[in-house]
Amino acid sequence: MLPAYLPNPFAALFGGGRPIDNGKTMSDGRRILGDGKTYRGFFVGLIFGALAGLMQMQLLEKYPVLFGVELPTFGTGGSNTTILIFALAVGSLFGDMFMSFFKRRMGLKRGAPLPVIDQLDFVLGALIFAYLASPVWFAEQFTFKVIAVILIITPLLHLATNVVGYFIGVKKEPW
């Protein structure tokens, strides 16, 4: 899940610049996504997600088992591995953007909290994109137990990273 967990924090940290929606609004007068979703943030997030996946693959070659648990892989290597890593990273970013779109439709401003959705939007996007990239791999790796652990751990990790982002000045809100 590292390729899914890292893109959005790095997009926030190194983002900025031209918004993906180019400042355009919908018929309701609200921005499509808002200033928080930028091209630079998207591509930086994608790069860091991909690098995380590649580093994870390198570590798995040396340490396939951690604390007695066999760690998941991204397939047998080659292009399938690359596709899966990018699917997780891109899915994470699109999941976050998708929910930003709906938050704007609900009249919520950038940074406004939407509990549970804010913590899991990127995970759902990553899981959907991973499934679309390789349904067989997805079924092998993401058992009910694994998904349950992800859904429990992710909100805690999300809160912790947002608090850190708030204290270092990257985020305006600690959520």
Swiss-Prot record:
The keyword Magnesium applies. It is found in: Cell membrane. Keywords: Cell membrane, Lipid biosynthesis, Lipid metabolism, Magnesium, Membrane, Phospholipid biosynthesis, Phospholipid metabolism, Transferase, Transmembrane, Transmembrane helix. GO terms for molecular function: CDP-2,3-bis-(O-geranylgeranyl)-sn-glycerol synthase activity. GO terms for biological process: glycerophospholipid biosynthetic process. InterPro entries: CarS, CarS_archaea. It comes from the Archaea. It is a multi-pass membrane protein. The chain crosses the membrane at residues 41-61, 82-102, 122-142, 147-167. Its EC number is 2.7.7.67. It catalyses: 2,3-bis-O-(geranylgeranyl)-sn-glycerol 1-phosphate + CTP + H(+) = CDP-2,3-bis-O-(geranylgeranyl)-sn-glycerol + diphosphate. The keyword Signal does not apply. Its cofactor is Mg(2+). It holds the Pfam family CarS-like. Pathway: Membrane lipid metabolism; glycerophospholipid metabolism. One of its GO terms (cellular component) is plasma membrane. Catalyzes the formation of CDP-2,3-bis-(O-geranylgeranyl)-sn-glycerol (CDP-archaeol) from 2,3-bis-(O-geranylgeranyl)-sn-glycerol 1-phosphate (DGGGP) and CTP. This reaction is the third ether-bond-formation step in the biosynthesis of archaeal membrane lipids. Belongs to the CDP-archaeol synthase family. HAMAP family: CDP_archaeol_synth. NCBIfam families: PRK04032.1 (NF003114). This is CDP-archaeol synthase. It comes from Methanococcoides burtonii (strain DSM 6242 / NBRC 107633 / OCM 468 / ACE-M).
